[in-house]
Amino acid sequence: MYLGIDIGTSAVKLVCAEADQILSTASVALDVSSPEPGWSEQHPDQWWQATCRALGQLSGRIALSEIKAIGLSGQMHGAVLLDRNKRPIRPAILWNDSRAVQECDDLRAAQPQIGHISGVLPLPGFTAPKIAWLRRHEPDRYGQLAHILLPKDYIGLRLHGALATDASDAAGTLWLDQSKRAWSPDIAKATDVELDWLPPVFDGHDIVGTVTAEAAAETGLPAGLPVVAGGGDAATGAVSLGATESGRGFISLGTSGQLFVADKVFRPNPERYVHAFAHTLPDRWYQMAAMLNGARPISWIGGQLGFSAAEVVALAETVSGDRLPIFLPYLTGERSPLGDPHIRGCFYGLEDSTTRADICRAVVESIAFCFADAAQSFGDTIDSLPELSAIGGGSQSDLLLGLIATTIGKPIVRPEGADSGPAYGAARLAACGHGALSMTDLADQPPETDRFEPGDPTALTARLNRFRALYSAVKAVD
């Protein structure tokens, strides 16, 4: 039995699995703090406390003593800043934080070729510009800085006491030279970072430590249990689906959204803000369009109207038509393919007759339109894919998957365990590190439970064109 721990933005999720079957899951919700407009933070100890609580839930259903190894997964890009005692000096600055706009401009000027080294152009959500921001705006805290980790790696530190990361999570910092899978001294220097602040980089299935006696006492896990490096949530989601070989892709619908295509070569496309990153497995890379808002607008509008996410989708299913409002879902700016941290959301086309169902439909459609824009940014790469799998909480919506299939013109497959993707992928990496699975086994794809074929695109194409025109108009005003 193998344990996968995924440090998400909205929850810590645990999956206990055999090599090819999920046995049990647990989840503990997380809160996000926004002390200033555009800021997004979580304290790393909140992740640890939630992990311990989730393990407590899991222990009521399975024997933790039977776990053979642990794999880690987590939200990418978060800046976990530690002092010499390996304790946090401030809350972590998350992937959807937009404070470091000026620092991104400075980094582009200092490193004009950064997109072809780091695989993407600088944007505020990435880790590197946040350190330059810290030096400029919080010099006392910058002076305490001795180690920089990513969210899942802090949980690794609490479990086994070692500083470590993997290539796929390191890829999202901007400090990684993607083709070499090693830290770039020049980019580190340009962002006021010492190389010895950054952890060693491993492959995702490498064992990097074992559970300490102290961690065992806090979690109920056996001391000495091996822990593998794991991966960023995009890469572990890929491992859960067998998207480790060229020509396989998927969409992820969580708080953020991703369109992911595996590759055997490093293929940068920075001009369209398509991320070209190292995979968590050796000699593999991927291209990914990353959307900051994903399925989050559904929960956002639900919060405004007093509905659950499921109720929003159910209402959206009751209406359709060209006179519905258009919604821009850019609640925290947008990354792929716009590279626009300043754009914000809005409704256009509200009328006296507009209903709550109309508004809900507009919000759900907007997510599909974002994926259509993302697919377009890939060019010919996306055309070669026969289908795309779907994971994440938003993948449970038949309406949303059908809309995405139609807007991008590809069948969408919902596999078994779709809502547990990254945590399950982390468990599979643990099984690989322990010897129960081979690299070849990790390419196995789970059975599909549902399939969504593209529908008639005519009506949606007209609304998609209005969606794109609305972005251009709002950007001009902004």
Predicted regions and their residues:
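Short, conserved phosphate/pyrophosphate- and ester-handling motifs at nucleotide-, phospho-/glycolipid
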Residues: 43, 97, 233
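Extracytoplasmic/secreted proteins and extracellular or luminal domains
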Residues: 60-63, 194, 381
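N-terminal glycine/serine-rich phosphate-binding loop of ATP-dependent small-molecule kinases
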Residues: 1-90, 116, 144, 216-217, ...
